[in-house]
Each structure stands twice: as C-alpha cells, then as structure tokens.
Amino acid sequence: MIGRLRGTLIEKQPPELLIEVSGVGYEVQMPMSCFYELPNVGEEAIIYTHFVVREDAQLLYGFNTVKERALFREVIKANGVGPKLGLGILSGMTASQFVQSVEREDISTLVKLPGVGKKTAERLVVEMKDRLKGWGAGDLFTPATDAAPMDSMPTVHDAEEEAVSALLALGYKPTQASKVVSQVAKDGMTSEQLIREALKSMV
C-alpha cells in the first residue's frame, strides 16, 4: 500500500495533481479543502495517501495530514459512500463544517453536497455521529488563505473552464457547475479561487 509520497509537484489540475517521486509520476486526487494548501508547481510536497484498487484502475487519494486521511477513511466506511463521493463531500465543505453537520444531524446542509441525497445524508448522520465524537474538527484542516498560490495567472476564460471541470470531477452537474462559476467569477480570479467561491455558494 502507498501511504505517503514526498516529491516534486509537477502539475495541478483540480482536483487532481501529479507528483514526481524518484523519477516516477503519481496521479493523486485530492479534496479541494486540501488542494488549496498545496505548494506551487516545482516545489516539494508531502502527501498522505489512501490507495484504492479496483478491477479497472488503481487510484490514489491525497491529503495534507494523517488526520485528514483518517476522516476520509471514516467517511467512506458509511454505507453507499465510495471514494469518489467521499472526495466530493470533503471538497464541498470544510472538515469542521462536515463534522458539525453530522453532529447536529443537519440533513438540509448535507444534501447540498454533490451526489448526496436525503437517504445518503441520513446514513452519514446515523453511521458517523458516534464515530466523530472527540475529533476536534477545528484541527482537521488548516484554514486556506483567500489568495491561492498559482505559478502563472491564467486567462479568465481558462480559469473558468478549469473551475467548471473541477466541479464536474467532484460530481456536480454540468449546468449547475457552469451557472455557479459564472455567478461567482470576478476579474483576476484564479481557478482555485473560483472553485472555492463556487463550493462556498452551494453549501
């Protein structure tokens, strides 16, 4: 099992990144809550990973800390929640918001996440409420700054396209993704800033 990668960040295409370790490039999918904290392309990164083996693919999911990964593993233990849905859940809101929503049995907030209907939200609450006690939600994710570091400033059109693509990868519908990105877009925003504002507006 691959549990940790330390190497050079080669590419960032939310929610996926490419990291080179000893000459080998690893494709890693990462929740946006973690993605915002990545260093610039060309810099060293340390990523804690969850390795998934399927019949048709081998996938890596990445996190900045061991505790973030542990929360992801708790989320995907819930009945009907796989890694892709877990990625969307932890991208659609911060860890603190997720833990609080589960503890408060806030179904109306959970159903706003991509791929989460009422039944899934209810299962998350029932199955995870006791398991999440004492997690210290405020420490799970480091708060992201408003200015996401980027190596080069993309054009507005490119940034919006990248943001829409990222939302689609997280499970949002095309019309919803395009609409919300257009609503939050402002001149000079990077794709990561657009994604963050779009996700905020939908929860």
Swiss-Prot record:
The keyword DNA repair applies. GO terms for molecular function: ATP binding; four-way junction DNA binding; four-way junction helicase activity. CDD domains: UBA_RuvA_C. Residues 155-203 are annotated as: Domain III. It is found in: Cytoplasm. Keywords: Cytoplasm, DNA damage, DNA recombination, DNA repair, DNA-binding. Has three domains with a flexible linker between the domains II and III and assumes an 'L' shape. Domain III is highly mobile and contacts RuvB. This is Holliday junction branch migration complex subunit RuvA. It comes from Vibrio atlanticus (strain LGP32) (Vibrio splendidus (strain Mel32)). The gene is ruvA.
